[in-house]
A protein has these predicted regions:
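Periplasm-facing N-terminal accessory domains of Gram-negative outer-membrane beta-barrel systems
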Residues: 3, 25-116
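Acidic, small-polar-rich N-terminal luminal/periplasmic segments of exported/outer-membrane proteins
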Residues: 44-47, 52-57, 71, 111-249, ...
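Outer-membrane beta-barrel translocator/receptor signature
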Residues: 215-217, 228-305, 311-315, 370, ...
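Acidic/polar loop-and-plug regions of large Gram-negative outer-membrane beta-barrel proteins
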Residues: 287, 291, 306-310, 314-379, ...
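Structural signature of Gram-negative outer-membrane beta-barrels, strongest in the C-terminal barrel
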Residues: 312, 427, 446-450, 454-458, ...
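Membrane-embedded beta-barrel scaffold of Gram-negative outer-membrane proteins
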Residues: 379-381, 385-391, 395, 399-401, ...
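C-terminal beta-signal and adjacent terminal beta-strands/loops
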Residues: 627, 731-748, 767-812
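Gram-negative outer-membrane beta-barrel transporters
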Residues: 649-741, 809-811
Length: 812
């Protein structure tokens, strides 16, 4: 029986189980529930407020939208206490009725301006706020792993346009490449993120489309290996985008952002109740902009509707969808000069103006991404909860352009014969996951348990084209006036359709065990299976005959164990081990598919909260070792020297070592400070030394040794400056290499590495809010720094120059 059938059966079982739970679980007849919203005096949500029932000492903390819920409360009358550091405590009477959910709304005396960065951004330490990406309600302080959450307030304060703007707030995670400006590729701890490491609301998403930041409530980063939770992911970390959710109180915001290069971006966000059991939210935006690059422009259309259904006192169903259409000019940047004829000089970045565009006046890239998801949450009781997520995603890309700017040194420096590229692809993703978590005790030992399973099914359809004239024309990137450029669109005919299916399945269990009040053990294991059934190729011009590719399958166990010592209430030390696996391409010497590479990670760290939660300092050290990196096989199956580079063996090794420092401070009311520094050393530490293998001791491309970030924002809350906000942020990426890593006995007589200098950028912001109106302005790259994002040796994209943007908003 094929795995595809098994995966389909598993997905059906997960779906059936979710439906069964929705309609068969009944509430406890002897208790009721309490829910509500907490707002500031000017109608904005108050997050992280302590909510407690005085008589039974039972409570919770309000969410980012100001909502709270307490379940399984015995029938009766109580007093609810709302408290927060620095705020006036509120005490109100409430009544609980069996089998019912009582709803109450509360308003704090302070307004949003007075509470800025305290209530909305949360004055609690980053170590006290659980991240949903971990699938368990564990505070980072008790988790032997580094976790970072970027809040909606930070995203708004910095007027983030793209996900790369948000990522600048996470030390050790950085934008590595922007190939043709079509997507953003992030790196962490020496490893590249890909679609396998990118998630939205816990479901894997394609990274080919640049996400819409205005729809995000927060962005979570779980650093290091997350294979036990998500299967085949790169060991550097994973990223989860949390979208805005429906609310049971009416409100919203309309805004208009404008800026340099004709940027115009209106946006709307509206939410409210449809009934006492159904809430909605719709946010959307349109964006139009030119560029600091000549002839480059873009248009984006985005909408994100969602519904929240209360299915009783313990269950809720969230239905979400979003659609993104992004049309823009693909741009391979400045390009390089290459000595491809003599093979004696390394590639160098072309010294041309930042604005010079090397493409045509007709080239285009159109991406369409549609997602839909259903999330079911159920509380059996206060300790046991169930989460089920089913999602569907469709991604389409239509691209036609000249590409890969690799000009020549001679005979005429800068001469480039422009090659054509055509991409026409469509991907469909079906994903499902089921998570059960609970808290219980065995004797005096407390447990927080997670057990779950997930399954993914991907189908990619790719059309290949025959383009009339593989070379479009010839230009000179150093002197555009030397040649007359073509302007017509060449004919491209479809010749084949390749369908590539991928199936993933995983089952996992982990337990956080409190051995003593100070010592906690986190242990778990996951079994993952990834299968690539045979590809099918349809020859569109040869009677539609079909050819099959080669079947491939890989499976692996991913264990995880961590020990945490809570030295004091506000200090914890931890050590952990985990591993992940990487699926390999190519064949072994017996013509079989390669097994996956197993990557081990070791981590040590300390987490501190000082000065009554006003200062948080976290320090982490890690070592990531790939002991079986796929390398070109030294000998063939007969023992003869191997000359076929597609025949490989797991004989290489890479090592990534580093440290990360995170600091967050709120010493003064209205002041928010974040800073971080990371060091990484990633090299090839073992190679077989034969032709085609990598060079021992060489640093991997796109892995800077140093990165750093920092931001400071202050909001005045009293006097004549009340409502004024000022801030600054900075980001640094150190020296790194573009190009390709060198191999033994390569054909080039020079290094294939392209050195790239480090760079730093500084942004400054200022804004003012009064009543429901706000205006915020930002000047980015204040020093007009000039540097590049380098993809291999042909997409050398300059970083943006100094730019100005401003956002005017009205909340209702």
């Amino acid at each position: 029986m094929s795995f595809l059938y098994n995966t389909t059966k598993i997905r059906r079982n997960i779906t059936a189980l979710s439906a069964l739970l929705i309609f068969t679980i009944t509430a406890n007849a002897q208790s009721g529930n309490l829910q509500g919203f907490i707002k500031t005096s000017d109608g904005k949500p108050a997050a992280e407020v302590n909510v407690q029932l005085k008589e039974i000492k039972k409570g919770t903390i309000s969410k980012t939208d100001g909502s709270f819920q307490i379940s399984n409360i015995p029938e009766g009358k109580y007093h609810i206490i709302l408290s927060f550091v620095g705020l006036q405590t509120i005490q109100k009477p409430v009544s609980i009725t069996s089998n019912q959910t009582s709803s109450y709304n509360f308003k704090l005396l302070e307004n949003e301006t007075e509470l800025t960065e305290i209530v909305v951004s949360a004055n609690r330490s980053i170590n006290d706020i659980p991240a949903s990406i971990g699938k368990l309600p564990i505070k980072p302080m008790d988790l032997p792993q580094a976790v970072v959450t970027v809040s909606e307030t930070t995203i708004k304060n910095q007027q983030a346009q793209r996900l790369s703007d948000v990522i600048k707030n996470v030390n050790g995670v950085y934008l590595g490449t922007t190939r043709a400006s079509t997507q953003e590729s992030f790196y962490a701890r020496g490893y590249s993120f890909s679609s396998t490491n990118m998630f939205k609301n816990g479901s894997r998403v394609n990274s080919g489309a640049m996400p819409e930041v205005s729809s995000l409530e927060s962005v979570e980063i779980l650093k290091g290996s997350a294979a036990i939770l998500y299967g085949n992911v790169a060991p550097g970390g994973i990223l989860n985008m949390i979208t805005k959710k429906p609310k049971f109180d009416f409100g919203g915001e309309v805004s208009l952002r404008a800026g340099s290069y004709n940027l115009i971006k209106p946006a709307i966000d509206i939410y409210g109740p449809l009934s006492n059991k159904i809430a909605y939210r719709v946010n959307g935006t349109f964006e139009s902009a030119d560029s600091y690059r000549d002839q480059v422009s873009s248009k984006r259309y985005y909408i994100n509707p969602s519904l929240l259904f209360k299915l009783g006192s313990r269950s809720e169903l969230i239905v979400e969808g979003d659609f993104l259409k992004h049309e823009f000019t693909p741009d391979f940047g400045t390009g390089t000069l290459n000595d491809s004829t003599k093979g004696i000089r390394p590639a160098t970045i072309a010294d041309v103006p930042r604005s010079r565009f090397m493409g045509t006046n007709w080239q285009y890239n159109k991406t369409y991404q549609t997602t839909a998801s259903v999330t079911f949450n159920h509380s059996f009781n206060q300790n046991w909860k169930l989460n089920t997520v089913l999602s569907y995603q469709q991604y389409k890309r239509d691209y036609f352009a000249v590409e890969r700017i690799q000009a020549l040194y001679d005979p005429q420096p800068g001469t480039w014969a422009r090659p054509l590229g055509r991409v026409d692809t469509k991907e469909k993703y079906f994903t499902g996951q089921l998570n059960l978590n609970g808290q219980f005790k065995t004797g005096k030992v407390a447990h927080i348990l997670l057990a779950g399973a997930d399954a993914d099914h991907y189908i990619t359809n790719t059309y290949n084209y025959d383009i009339q004239g593989k070379i479009y024309d010839t230009i000179n990137i150093l002197d555009p006036n030397k040649f007359v450029q073509r302007t017509d669109i060449p004919v491209a005919n479809r010749v084949t359709l390749v369908e590539t299916p991928v199936n993933r399945f995983g089952a996992y269990v982990q337990d956080l065990i409190s051995l003593t009040p100070k010592i906690k053990l986190l242990a778990g294991v996951r079994w993952s299976l990834q299968e690539s059934p045979s590809n099918s190729t349809t020859y569109l011009q040869k009677n539609d005959s079909i050819a099959k590719g080669k079947f491939a399958s890989a499976s692996a166990f991913s264990p995880r164990v961590g020990l945490l010592y809570r030295y004091k209430q506000n200090t914890s030390f931890f050590a952990s081990y985990s591993n992940s696996f990487a699926v390999n391409t190519g064949l072994d010497i017996y013509n079989n598919t390669l097994p996956p590479s197993i990557i081990d990670q070791y981590e040590l760290g300390v987490k501190n909260i000082f000065c009554k939660v006003r200062l948080t300092v976290n320090l982490t050290a890690y070592k990531i070792i790939n002991n079986n990196l796929a390398q070109t096989a030294q000998f063939d199956k007969d023992g003869n020297p191997n000359s076929n580079s597609s025949l490989k063996e797991l004989t290489g090794q890479t090592s990534s070592n580093g440290i990360e420092l995170d600091v967050m401070a709120n010493f003064v009311k209205g002041l928010s400070v974040m800073a971080g520094y990371s060091y990484n050393d990633m090299h090839y530490t073992k190679t077989p030394g034969n032709k085609g293998s990598y060079v021992k001791g060489e640093r991997l491309v796109n892995t800077p040794a140093h990165t750093a970030n920092g931001s400071v924002f202050y909001t005045f809350s009293r006097g004549k400056l009340n409502g004024l906000k000022i801030g600054a942020s900075a980001f640094y990426v150190g020296k790194r290499f573009g190009g390709w890593n060198n191999t033994i006995q390569q054909s080039q007589n020079y290094s294939r590495l392209i050195p790239v200098d480090g760079f730093a950028t500084v942004d400054i912001s200022a804004g003012y809010s009064i009543n429901r109106f706000s205006l915020l302005a930002k000047l980015s790259n204040l020093t007009n720094t000039y540097n590049y994002y380098v993809h291999e040796n042909y997409s050398i994209n300059p970083i943006p120059p100094r730019q100005f943007i401003a956002t005017f908003a009205y909340r209702f």
